[in-house]
Amino acid sequence: MGSVNPAVAGYPYRVHSAAVTTQLQFRDDAYLKSSRAQVHAISERGIVLDRTIFYPLGGGQLGDVGVLVRSNGERIAIADTRKGDTVESVVHIPAPGAPLLQPGEEVALEIDWERRYSLMRLHTALHLLSCVVVAPVTGGNIAPDRGRLDFDIDMSKLDAGRIEGETNALIASGVPTETVWITDAELDAQPDLVKTMSVQPPRGAGRVRLLKIPGIDLQPCGGTHVRNIAEIGAIRVVRIRNEGKRNKRVEIALAS
């Protein structure tokens, strides 16, 4: 079930509806900064809502932070967001000492947009990086200040200047991104779509979401992305280092 969050430890599991699922609003529109929702359940892990704009930790991308606002104006800080016990449930983890919400209660949702937008820009930039460095991806992580990919490649083939220049040239092309859905069976028939060896595509609902950058990239991804790669602005290569036989790490940051 996952670790117990100290902010809600000791409270009994309470549910407003038998079906504890969450409408993933961030999946349909990553640019939603605020929304409204109803509390579905309170568990030892945190708060489950009937819908959310908060992206949960996954695919190397950090979970969103922000606040839930009660009808009386009281603000509950959300310190992290994680996946729930089912494919389409999301747990909002309140900061320690936060007031406890009640099942059925209506709340307003506000994400830390500046942080999220940085994550979106960097996540899309990493997709471009995976096209510039043509090698199996063995790991990755996206934080607000920088992102990184690990590659199974010889260090001698990684030149920071070339990588930075080619990635920024792709960004400058200003290509719009697209969301494509395929079935699990269609993905199984096209294994080459999966570049990342350490992260499995988001399965479980019978279909898989792909990020398409026409003419550049197509791969499974459940994360949040910019509408046009020009929004990334530009990136800089922070460092390249050897993390092991099959892990050569390329770290990037936004240039502005």
Model-inferred region functions:
Residues 2-256:
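Active-/binding-site microenvironments in catalytic and ligand-binding cores
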